[in-house]
């Protein structure tokens, strides 16, 4: 994303605060094929048992944890909000589950934020500034702080974003190197396990661990250049432990 500012916005427990009645109605209009099933699922109130409370608490808002369609219902429930913000053309926005972000110049991003704060509660979406981040790519931190004055937000030059990293090149490289260091430690731990359980360690490696850096290499430009310590750990420690001999 080539935006000069990127605002990453989080809202706490959004799945629990979603306006259920509005979400079910939106599903009736936008996802009619599943609307009857969702209505039957949520026509009653799930009981929540809280330690120290004699009577169960009835879940009247949001989606129920464990519901296979909870994520899909939430997505349809906030879709009108997403479309409303998009139609006003403030800036480029990205939504993933209950996390929202917007990229662009500082003025339009602030207008997008004001609209989100104003319209979000109507859909059960309650933004929380203290858990939000403003990524400033060109080093103008003071300008960004002035634009978002009054909001307890974090201002950085680089940060994680949707599993990758975004921001100033040097800062992104530092974050990436820290991530690679943790991967090297994980590979070394798997190498120790591979001496006794080589097949299990190999399955953990190909099914889980390598997927992490495989994704980062796809979404972070130049990530492969920082992977040399990881390549060395795999070649010198993990593979010899799996095969029981030097490679």
What does each model-identified segment do?
Residues 1-247:
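Nucleic-acid-interacting cores, centered on viral/eukaryotic replication and modification enzymes
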């Amino acid at each position: 994303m080539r935006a000069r500012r990127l605002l990453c916005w989080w809202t706490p427990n959004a799945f629990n605060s979603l306006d259920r009645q509005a979400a079910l109605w939106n599903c009736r209009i936008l996802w009619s094929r599943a609307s009857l099933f969702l209505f039957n699922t949520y026509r009653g109130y799930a009981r929540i048992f809280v330690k120290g409370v004699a009577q169960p608490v009835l879940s009247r808002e949001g989606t129920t944890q464990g519901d296979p369609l909870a994520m899909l219902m939430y997505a349809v429930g906030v879709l009108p909000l997403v479309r409303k913000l998009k139609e006003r053309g403030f800036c480029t926005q990205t939504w993933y589950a209950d996390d929202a972000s917007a990229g662009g110049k500082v003025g339009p991003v602030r207008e997008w934020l004001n609209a989100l704060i104003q319209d979000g509660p109507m859909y059960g979406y309650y933004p929380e500034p203290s858990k939000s981040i403003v990524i400033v790519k060109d080093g103008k931190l003071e300008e960004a702080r002035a634009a978002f004055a009054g909001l307890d937000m974090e201002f950085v030059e680089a940060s994680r974003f949707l599993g990758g990293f975004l921001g100033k090149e040097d800062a992104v490289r530092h974050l990436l190197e820290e991530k690679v260091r943790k991967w090297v430690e994980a590979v070394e731990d798997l190498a120790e396990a591979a001496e006794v359980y080589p097949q299990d360690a190999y399955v953990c490696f190909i099914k889980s661990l390598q997927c992490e850096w495989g994704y980062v290499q796809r979404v972070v430009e130049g990530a492969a250049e920082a992977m040399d310590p990881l390549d060395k750990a795999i070649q010198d420690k993990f593979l010899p432990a799996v095969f029981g001999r030097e490679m």
